[in-house]
C-alpha cells in the first residue's frame, strides 16, 4: 500500500496561509469583539485556540485521517452508534439539550463526530494487533502458560518434579502452591506487563520453542516476599494467542500510544507549524515520528 503522508500544514485546522514555520489564518486582523479600548481579532482567537487546544485538535485531525485510511465506517458501526444514541435518549433526561450544550447540533452530528470515531478507534487498536505483530512480540513477549506459585524453592522443586512426571498443573498446584496463590496452574497470558513474575521467566516462556514443562525454578519478590515459580508453556505462537493478547493489552495506555505511533510512522506524519511542534515536543515527543531523536531517553 502506498504511504500517503499526513501533514499538519496549512490545510489543517482551516489554515490558509503560513508565515515562516507558523500557521496563520485568513482575515486575521478582523475584529471579532471589543471591551473598553481593547479589541480582539480573528488572529487573537486563533492563536489562543492553537495554544490551548492546538495539540489535542491536531491529533484528533490526524486520527481521523488514519481512520479514513485504515478503518472504514461500516453499516455495523452506524448501527452500534445509533443504538448508543437510542440508549442515551432512553436513560438520560434532556439528552439533545446536553449535547447541544457541548456544541453539537443534534444527535446525528454527535453520533458522527463522537460515537463513530470511538468505534473506529477500537477497530484500529484491534487491527494494530495484526498489523504490528512483530513489534508486539518484540516489546511484550507474549506467551500463554500454566504457572504455579510456591512458597519457596524447595517446594517448587517438588512441584517441578511432579510436572515432569506428567501430573496436571492444576493438580500439582493443589498440593504445592502457596496459600492464596495468584498462579494456580490455570492458563494465563504472560507479557512484559506482568510485573509479579521475573523477567527471566517471561523471557524463557517467550523464547522456548516447544510447549511443555520449563525445567527450571524461577523466583521473584512480591510485596516484600520472595516466591518460587514453575511453569508449563502452553503456546507462544502469536496467531494462536493473539485474541488473548488483544484482550489483555488493548486497554493499556502504552499500547494505545504505541498503536497511534505505529500508524503515524506508516503515513509519515509531519508537523510544519512551529507552535504545535513545540507543544508536541514538550508533551508527546513520540508523536513526532519524523524526529525520533526527540523521544529518545536521556539515560
What are these regions (language model features)?
Residues 1-23:
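Sec-dependent N-terminal signal peptides of Gram-positive bacterial secreted proteins and lipoproteins
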Residues 19-110:
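N-terminal targeting/tethering segments
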Residues 24-26, 49-53, 103-151, 161, ...:
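PPIase-associated folding chaperone regions across multiple families
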Residues 85-92, 187-194, 290-291, 296-299:
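Low-complexity, repetitive regions of proteins mediating host interaction that are extracellular
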Residues 155-163:
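Short, aromatic-enriched amphipathic alpha-helices that serve as compact interaction elements
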Residues 162-203:
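Peptidyl-prolyl cis-trans isomerase
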